[in-house]
Regions:
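Amphipathic alpha-helical packing segments from all-alpha helical-bundle domains
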Residues: 78, 107-112, 122-147, 151-158
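Solvent-exposed, amphipathic alpha-helical segments
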Residues: 26-34, 80-84, 114, 163-167
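N-terminal intrinsically disordered/low-complexity leader segments
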Residues: 1-18, 195-196
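Helix-turn-helix
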Residues: 22, 26, 30-64, 68
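Hydrophobic alpha-helical connector segments
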Residues: 68, 79-112, 160
């Protein structure tokens, strides 16, 4: 006589959990793709394949999410600026890194989304203005450190920044095959000594 074999219970799959940053990043992705009207708890949860209940582990409500999204974007921008200083020893390396960074589309998309949101939200407008000012000031410092006088440094910083923002907010971005060559030529143009 054989005894029936007991079937081992299949382990339950672990519940999917995502951290607060995943919610904020997805909110910015949705803001970019569909506008503020679609930045809703249900929409984000569906995109993340989570329940709405998981949202409340991280946020009180949608307003808390929107405030947190702006602050998260701002902090990421400030962290990027700080990271440049630690990853490059010379100002020319930092300038080159900023030019190269322009090509990173996800961050560009988040920047576009935040700029659009800033048109209707005071907190976002303050964050964008602060980040713009810090970016231009930082670039000015790099051009000063590269040997340019204050006016030249300021003009070059603004030219680079306007190029960077303009490239991803207009339909005039270069073809992928042209990007590397254009980035190199822009770098050489910006770090070339003035010809006065």
């Amino acid at each position: 006589m054989t005894l029936p074999t007991s079937r081992a219970a299949k382990p339950r799959p672990a519940k999917k959990t995502l951290d607060r940053d995943a919610w904020l990043k997805k909110a910015l992705d949705i803001l970019f793709a569909h506008g503020i009207s679609q930045v809703k708890i249900e929409v984000i949860a569906r995109k993340l394949k989570l329940t709405k209940g998981s949202f409340y582990w991280h946020f009180r409500n949608r307003d808390d999410l929107l405030r947190s999204m702006v602050e998260w974007w701002r902090e990421n921008q400030l962290r990027f600026i700080s990271g440049l200083t630690h990853s490059h020893a010379d100002p020319q390396g930092i300038i080159r890194a900023v030019i190269t960074f322009t090509q990173h589309t996800e961050d560009s998309n988040h920047d576009i989304a935040m700029r659009e949101f800033a048109r209707f939200n005071k907190q976002a407008a303050r964050a964008v203005a602060e980040v713009d000012q810090l970016r231009v000031s930082y670039l000015s410092e790099m051009f000063l450190a590269a040997g340019f006088d204050p006016l030249e440094a300021s003009l070059r910083a603004r030219a680079l920044y306007f190029y960077q923002v303009g490239e991803y907010t207009t339909s005039l971005a270069p073809e992928p095959s042209e990007r590397e060559e254009m980035a190199e030529k822009l770098y050489r143009l910006l770090v070339r000594a003035p010809t006065s």
